[in-house]
């Protein structure tokens, strides 16, 4: 299950990034 850890981290990171972008669209734009 070692190969699942990095995959999960990447998925969680992507989700967090999308959530952050959706939460503050006026931040970077």
From Swiss-Prot:
Name of the protein in question: Protein 1.5
């Amino acid at each position: 299950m070692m190969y699942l850890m990095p995959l999960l981290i990447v998925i969680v990171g992507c989700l967090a990034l999308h959530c952050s972008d959706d939460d503050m669209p006026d931040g970077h734009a």
